[in-house]
């Protein structure tokens, strides 16, 4: 008997649903959540004050987020007319693929990159194509070699999630220069606020000067506003027009716009966040590197997390269980081809000391 139900499109059937970071253990116990790359310092006091301010939830938000776009343009030296806001940068990444790729097209990204890129490609019926990494970092030569006449979108996260790797300005420029002009280059800068000004990868300048570059950012990481779901992108006017055509008309809430506006106005908080992250990331990766004789290897990271590889007698699953017993949820990544890796968000100094100690004890026990 034939199936008469509405049939899901074949390319949608190929999607593996995004799996968010966990906050509970196997028995349902609450854990300290270091699995989603949230800010351990919370958000700016100014943003919190904006969230607490009375408002009218019966009214629709500004559909164009004009005040927020103007403030972003002021802080980053951009043209507000070349900025669009979204429900997190995830929405904008998906819409970029939807607007510029479809069945018969290819969407290109590195093997160990943000899992949303694969989903974004499949959602619009395009074919996801993975270029091999070089020791868990994006390889410009491999990406360029994977470009075909079917390539329509290239996604690069910089810094990269889940590995923390980073392509410097000259490599980003080389990648862009090697792409055909009719290929959209999406530079996902979700973790850019964790970089120093000297580490700027030149994305904004590329987006301002070229017709095929879109840069996305988010308020979910350094700004500590993950619960409000706010992202933004900048690029050529025809990109902004395309994204405005396909996005929801009221896609950023009143509270989200107010909190983001206040957060952008408090760059001192971003500086404190960066300083905390740099200090604790360095301490933690040093502690993990000291366990190299146990086959434990932290990858270099410019983000707010460390990807720790377990290549010796201590398995990642065993370390994951030990950390849960110690009260922590971190991200195990077998679904992204990293069954031997744990992505660990940088938390407080106390958190990182306890995690390092737990892993060291588990490594000794596994000998």
UniProtKB/Swiss-Prot annotation:
<dbReference type="InterPro" id="IPR005861">
    <property type="entry name" value="HisP_aminotrans"/>
</dbReference>
<dbReference type="GO" id="GO:0004400">
    <property type="term" value="F:histidinol-phosphate transaminase activity"/>
</dbReference>
<dbReference type="InterPro" id="IPR050106">
    <property type="entry name" value="HistidinolP_aminotransfase"/>
</dbReference>
<keyword id="KW-0028">Amino-acid biosynthesis</keyword>
<dbReference type="InterPro" id="IPR015421">
    <property type="entry name" value="PyrdxlP-dep_Trfase_major"/>
</dbReference>
<dbReference type="InterPro" id="IPR015424">
    <property type="entry name" value="PyrdxlP-dep_Trfase"/>
</dbReference>
<dbReference type="Pfam" id="PF00155">
    <property type="entry name" value="Aminotran_1_2"/>
</dbReference>
<dbReference type="InterPro" id="IPR004839">
    <property type="entry name" value="Aminotransferase_I/II_large"/>
</dbReference>
<dbReference type="InterPro" id="IPR015422">
    <property type="entry name" value="PyrdxlP-dep_Trfase_small"/>
</dbReference>
<dbReference type="GO" id="GO:0030170">
    <property type="term" value="F:pyridoxal phosphate binding"/>
</dbReference>
<keyword id="KW-0032">Aminotransferase</keyword>
<keyword id="KW-0808">Transferase</keyword>
<dbReference type="InterPro" id="IPR001917">
    <property type="entry name" value="Aminotrans_II_pyridoxalP_BS"/>
</dbReference>
<comment type="pathway">
    <text>Amino-acid biosynthesis; L-histidine biosynthesis; L-histidine from 5-phospho-alpha-D-ribose 1-diphosphate: step 7/9.</text>
</comment>
<comment type="subunit">
    <text>Homodimer.</text>
</comment>
<protein>
    <recommendedName>
        <fullName>Histidinol-phosphate aminotransferase</fullName>
        <ecNumber>2.6.1.9</ecNumber>
    </recommendedName>
</protein>
<keyword id="KW-0368">Histidine biosynthesis</keyword>
<dbReference type="GO" id="GO:0000105">
    <property type="term" value="P:L-histidine biosynthetic process"/>
</dbReference>
<feature type="modified residue" description="N6-(pyridoxal phosphate)lysine">
    <location>
        <position position="221"/>
    </location>
</feature>
<comment type="similarity">
    <text>Belongs to the class-II pyridoxal-phosphate-dependent aminotransferase family. Histidinol-phosphate aminotransferase subfamily.</text>
</comment>
<keyword id="KW-0663">Pyridoxal phosphate</keyword>
